[in-house]
Amino acid sequence: MDTPINVFSNWVQSGKDEGMEKNHSSSVENMIEFATKELNSYSFIDAGCGNGWVVRNVSNSDACNSATGVDGSSDMIKKAKGLDVKSNYYCTDLMDWEPEKKVDLVHSMEVFYYFEKPELLIKHIYNNWIKSGGRLIMGIDFYKENIPSHSWQEDCAISIMKMFSEKNWIEFFQNAGFMNIKSWRHGEKDDWSGTLVVTGIK
């Protein structure tokens, strides 16, 4: 078993990180469209940005006035910076980092369950990253109701992967203080339950 950061750093070196955009683009597009449809102008952070593909895509929107990516993998951030000179990237532990200015929208795809206590990260983002009236939106494929995902921790040999139910994730948002919480599944097919999306307003 290896740490999530080491595993994803190895993915950069092997080029496997590029598959993340292909595999997750539909879910991310669904989330970003929902989160930005009523915003004329917004600031954006991608929590666990990987090689920066979401930041690059969002920053191309005329409505986005600033885009920032944060990730714990130095290899991922190095690649992100090499591909994108106009956005801001930080290599740091998400639990320790705070933006200079709070933002309108924080997005995260396939990240939160790699933390020992994701509920603390959600609370940290609520307290320190998001403006009043701002939104957190997250997507995960690794959750209790998505049976095919149950073997992933063993398959990928990752030391920390926390399995929770949809109800648990909604409670994490509620306990952090978020309001108007919504959840849905995107991309359900056969025995695949789809990406679980949870979002709320501060």
Which role does the model predict for each range below?
Residues 1-37, 144-145:
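Conserved class I S-adenosyl-L-methionine
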Residues 119-132:
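A short glycine-rich, Lys/Arg-flanked "PGG" loop and its adjoining helix->strand segment in the class I
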Residues 161-176:
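Short alpha-helix
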Residues 185-202:
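Core SAM-dependent methyltransferase catalytic element
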Residues 107:
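A conserved beta-strand element that flanks and buttresses the S-adenosyl-L-methionine
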